[in-house]
Swiss-Prot record:
Family of this protein: Belongs to the LOR family.
Reported function: Might be related to the phospholipid scramblase and tubby-like superfamily of membrane tethered transcription factors.
InterPro entries: LOR (IPR007612), LOR_sf (IPR038595), Tubby-like_C (IPR025659)
Protein name: Protein LURP-one-related 9
Pfam family of the protein (one): LOR
Coiled-coil annotated residue ranges, if any: none
Organism of derivation: Arabidopsis thaliana
Length: 197
């Protein structure tokens, strides 16, 4: 079982989701996450132009499940930290994600769970998970690198009209016993990183 946010987000069957992104204003964007029956599962909101690009993933009732933000004010590469709830305390760190290569045109991330020791420097730690993206859009596959196990796949439904309007969607397929809240958080981070290229 791959449980990062919580076991309640690990289904014993393949989970398929639809994620719709829309720009609410020049400063804010929102992601709505639905199951295939069109039931709202999560929302993600946050500012595009705030200093740390903070995003909050909430359940359908509006309760914060996790918060995402960039590490540092002007990063050379995009480093993200993800915390439980609306916290930014180091003891609530769920995982960190960073681009493995600054000069790559593909959107890929190395994802690291917090180390057992008190140090939060993940620069020399091997990633626990990796995403591999495409050259265009925010599609990616999530792998567990030691056994090269595919955990999830995200497909960006790219259209030029959606790009101009600032709204588009994703299809998400998460394998059994894999935390789908974790995958949605990686989708938001990947999309944000891809949009800044």
């Amino acid at each position: 079982m791959v449980s990062v946010v919580g076991e309640m987000f690990c289904n014993p069957y393949t989970t398929e989701l639809v994620v719709r992104r829309r720009r609410e204003s020049l400063k804010r964007e929102r992601y709505d996450v639905f199951d295939l029956s069109n039931n709202l599962i999560f929302t993600v909101d946050g500012g595009i132009w705030n200093i740390r690009r903070k995003r909050v993933l909430r359940d359908a009732a509006g309760i914060p499940l996790l918060s995402m933000r960039t590490k540092g004010l002007v990063p050379m590469r995009y480093n993200w930290e993800v915390y439980k709830g609306d916290s930014t305390e180091s003891d609530n760190l769920l995982f960190s994600a960073r681009e493995p290569n600054l000069l790559s045109f593909k959107t890929s991330l190395d994802v690291t769970l917090p180390p057992d020791q008190s140090s939060t420097d993940i620069s020399s730690v091997e990633p626990d998970f990796q995403t591999f993206g495409r050259y265009i859009g925010s599609s990616f596959k999530l792998f567990e690198p030691i056994h090269n196990t595919l955990l999830a796949e995200v497909v960006h439904d790219f259209t030029w009209g959606g790009l101009i309007k600032g709204s588009y969607s994703f299809k998400v397929r998460v394998n059994p016993y894999v935390d789908f809240a974790f995958v949605v958080a990686l989708l938001v981070i990947t999309d944000d990183t891809s949009n800044l290229r």
